[in-house]
Amino acid sequence: MHIRKTITILAALSAVAGCGTRKYCNTVKIDGDDGNTIIEKAADVVPTANQLAALDREFIAFIHFGPNTFTGKEWGSGFESSETFALETLDTDQWCKAIKDAGMKMVIFTAKHHDGYIMWQSRYTDHGIMSSKFRDGKGDVLKDLSESCRKYGLELGIYLSPADLYQIESPDGLYGNLSRPFLRTIPREVEGRPFSNKTKFKFNVDDYNEYYLNQLFELLTEYGPISEIWLDGAHPKTKGGQTYNYNAWRELIRTLAPKANIFGREDLRWCGNEGGHTRDSEWNVVPYMANPDTLTWYSDMMADPLGGREQLCEGKYLHYQPAETDVSVRDGWFWRDNTHQQTRTADNVFDMYERSVGGNAILLLNLPPDNQGRFPEKDLKTLEETGRRIRETYGIDLLEGAKCPKALLDNNIDTYIKVKDGEDFIVTLPEKRWINRIVLQEAIATVGERTERFAVDARIDGEWKEIATSTNIGHKRILRVNDIETDALRFRLLQSRAMVAISKISAHYSHWGPFYGNPFDIPELQDYDKNAWKTEGNSNVLVLGGQRRLGGIVYNPAAGKSESGIVSGVVSISDDGLSWTEVSSFEFGNLVNDPTPRYVHFHNPVGSRYLRIVSESLDPTLIGLF
């Protein structure tokens, strides 16, 4: 007969790193260990102070802003004129106030995207805002943003793309120019532009790495403090076998910004998609085949599951590495227009918040300003409503006044109760209350992520009923349950990697359902025979079988296989199949990482008997008409 054991601990317990026989660490070698030893070691892998700070931020903002804002492209080409960035007005206070009001803690800004265009007053190039007409070439978007962040109490992060199409395409470009590495001083002195920070570095690097390091120095010493450096792994194009001296980058970053996390490297990882999705079990203890603390290149982690027992045993090292879930509030990372470009609903963003933040990850929501330097009104409405829902749902803890171990309700992540497999604890409310959300947290900073399976019961009309089961907890697990009226909750630990340390439990009520419809308004698609495409070379012609009125096309890469990061083309119409009129052109960036439907809206609806798409890498059978 199974006898249930009940936790009776009433006082907070705290763990000390390295105490007893346990060894708590951020990275541990497991090569040659048996399965049981590996799981024991995994239970003691903990975040660094910087990683814990990143998890505690929970909800942060991304801002994509640059020449693409004015060209309507997702990825630039590197051939853009400096004057393409035709900004006349800028309101970073509006950005930061909206971000702060939504409950976000940090802003990450695209100081340089893949096009290589610089959004601050750099000493090391004239391809950037310094050559635009904005404020007579003296404008500095990053400086304005830095000041607004300080004003509104937000942390600042920078996105500095390692890829650089301008430095690839320019005749005098530094990327892949086959320059010889030699010992160079960082930062390189520029007459009339001295640095107040007198730190110097010596690195054996080539031209492009020197350029990148000089700009990192500018950003980290003149716009800080910087809390995150976002190193995107996307590369639209490469040249000359260019490599990155990440050891030098890391040394400079750790010296100048010791509290900054490096995304895309050992500190923070990509969740594996750009659609706001997390794994059902998003473990932050993950396997590596080599020591992640000394690697110079980090591959995207796409596996699902990623940190389960079987996956851990396949590695040679275990490492704590939180996931960021990046997604844009619009169908695209840059603003294109206020007419056709869709904006996510508050239902959708709130759902992603609960699944990502409540799934042991960080939600990074992109908010692209428009060509007037402001957030568009419909984006603001989504952001405002999302923030309101977060506050009204999670700002009130319905377990206040409950009877349970003190450590569970003291809001201190370092105090906790210990729970073994088969044990449980009970939280008794002062009276019956309606709830539909339950939040649990583990003491990951001092003990680690250990819960593998658990269940929660509610006492309803005097009887215990199971209302939820789940897998890992980690930093935070949000359980969304049906509306119930209860006077007690019971947590049951079903499986773990070691003694579990539960640091917090709370209950809440959301007036909004846990599920949502479509994130965007989707045009009604027209039916047509997809076998009617005729393909010759790069030209794909569709015989419409009569006069049809068309508003545009939609490409759905998720239904097929996309080998290319960029798909571009031209759409034309004809009444006889001989004489063609161009009605639109398109360029889809980043289809591999974000395989969501892409809409091409014609300037005006058109009537036609034939439709032609000229593109080198487009499967016409994945096209819809509207």
Ranges and model annotations:
Residues 374, 378, 382, 393, ...:
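Aromatic, loop-rich ligand-recognition surfaces of beta-strand-rich domains
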Residues 17-18:
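C-terminal motif of bacterial Sec signal peptides marking the signal peptidase cleavage site
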Residues 588-589:
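Surface-exposed loop and turn segments in beta-propeller and other repeat-based domains
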Residues 1-5:
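Positively charged n-region of N-terminal signal peptides that target proteins for export
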Residues 22-450, 454, 458, 466-481, ...:
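Mature catalytic domains of secreted/periplasmic carbohydrate-active enzymes
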Residues 6-14:
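Sec-dependent N-terminal signal peptides
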